[in-house]
Each structure stands twice: as C-alpha cells, then as structure tokens.
Amino acid sequence: MRDKIKLVSSAGTGHFYTTTKNKRTMPEKMEIKKFDPVVRKHVLYKEAKIK
C-alpha cells in the first residue's frame, strides 16, 4: 500500500513536497536532494509524517 509522506527541507525554510511511498519495498525513511525555491538551491529533503 502506498502511503502519503511529506518531504521537509533540511535548510530550515519550512518548504516541503508531498509524495507517496511504498512502505513494503522501502521501509526506511526517505532522503532525497531536491530544489528549495526559498533558498534557490538543491538541498536534502527528509521524510516526515503528514498530520
């Protein structure tokens, strides 16, 4: 089952992306480099729960 997750910027800007993830094939927390438009750079985004 694919669950919705939130990817939060590690730059501390509060910017986030939402996506889905298959928890059965990828049980560990996701970390991916994406573009943060607030600081206008590519930074590390870490998985967080959607509240």
UniProtKB/Swiss-Prot annotation:
Q: What is one process in the GO biological process aspect for this record?
A: translation
Single Gene Ontology MF annotation: structural constituent of ribosome
SUPFAM superfamilies, A to Z: Zn-binding ribosomal proteins
The record's GO CC annotations read: cytosolic large ribosomal subunit
PROSITE patterns from the xrefs?
Answer: RIBOSOMAL_L33
Q: Which NCBIfam families match?
A: PRK00595.1 (NF001860), rpmG_bact (TIGR01023)
Q: What is this protein called?
A: Large ribosomal subunit protein bL33
